[in-house]
Amino acid sequence: MLAPMAGVTNVTFRTLCREFGSTRGNLLRPAPPHLRSPLEQSQVGTISGLYVCEMVTARALVERNAVTIHMTTFAPDESPRSLQLYTVDPATTYTAAKMVADEGLADHIDMNFGCPMPKVTRRGGGAALPYKRRLFGQIVAAAVRATEGTKIPVTVKFRIGIDDEHHTHLDAGRIAEAEGAAAVALHARTAAQRYSGTADWAQIAQLKQQVRTIPVLGNGDIYDASDALAMMAVTGCDGVVIGRGCLGRPWLFAELSAAFTGRPAPAPPTLGEVAEIVRRHGKLLVAHFGEDKGMRDIRKHIAWYLHGFPAGSELRNALALVKTLDELDCLLNRLDGAVPFPDAAIGPRGRQGSPAWVALPDSWLTDPDDCTVPIGADIMESGG
């Protein structure tokens, strides 16, 4: 499962990940649907093959915010269409989930209770919310109730808890299971850890022991296919969620597909092959956003794509300022395409940072059974 990541998992990146997830043979030429074997086609869109769009707020969706609606763009052949909702209010959750169901906006709803960012937690949202267990249960129940009678599953993603003194994942898992969630996913870090340190896979194993009737997915520190297999072996979880590990590496899903089906791993791409993937990503972004915004967006991806490769500071700096597709093409032609995939490109990528105190609303920890909806927690400046 591709984890929703703000500013990353839009339709363009999901397209690349989906294509690689159904690769047959050549890593750079994924098999289109009409060329997949019946077995390959049947595996596309299973719980281990979901590619979730970047998070949108339930309130912004209900208000039909233009930016939010554009963020929920899916490719014509994308199936199932997975949408993640950020929400703090049962009533708004119900309205948003009902809108998704009634208008056919998506085939799967994931719910975000894992964001550790201060602007979110200080208002009681994201990773702070599961501490309010009654409110958390009401929100999950609202989404499930809104999709009753449809084939739209509701899944729930959360963290271990606020910090080492306030773990919430076991309660959250049991509550989500009781309220009808189809699966739960645990990012095995606390909000205080943010993206730093090491994911505590033992907590995934504990959650799996507590949640028995629905799948439990694990998230955290999966950077290659062997990590995914190791997590499942160690924790007993039913599947994995890939986040930062696939930044600049959409072909990771080809490696995962091979590992889970017992096929030989595809050869890692050369620098020339990576350049071709960057070109395709850039073209998809321009088609989605237009050239100006598309090229501004590709810049961060280029840094991830070239992670560990020798490229030189001058060329990297030029790529970090690229403005047009033609310029992108010229700059990529300057790379040495024969360079093999380097060992330095393997391992952690993306933001890591340091642990930090978690900002919370006043008296947030006083009563975990308080189901008062936090004020202003569902208002995002981005429209997402």
Curated annotation (Swiss-Prot):
Annotated signal sequence range: none
Carries keyword Mitochondrion?
no
Listed binding positions for FMN are: P4, M5, A6, Q84, K157, N219, G220, D221, G243, R244
Query: Which reactions are catalysed by this chain?
Result: a 5,6-dihydrouridine in tRNA + NAD(+) = a uridine in tRNA + NADH + H(+); a 5,6-dihydrouridine in tRNA + NADP(+) = a uridine in tRNA + NADPH + H(+)
Which enzyme class, named as a word?
Answer: oxidoreductase
Where on the tree of life does the source sit, at the highest rank?
A: Bacteria
Which co-factor is required?
A: FMN
Quote the function comment for this protein: Catalyzes the synthesis of 5,6-dihydrouridine (D), a modified base found in the D-loop of most tRNAs, via the reduction of the C5-C6 double bond in target uridines.
Name the UniProt record assigns to this protein: Probable tRNA-dihydrouridine synthase
Instruction: Write the lineage as a comma-separated list.
Output: Bacteria, Bacillati, Actinomycetota, Actinomycetes, Mycobacteriales
Gene (name only) = dus
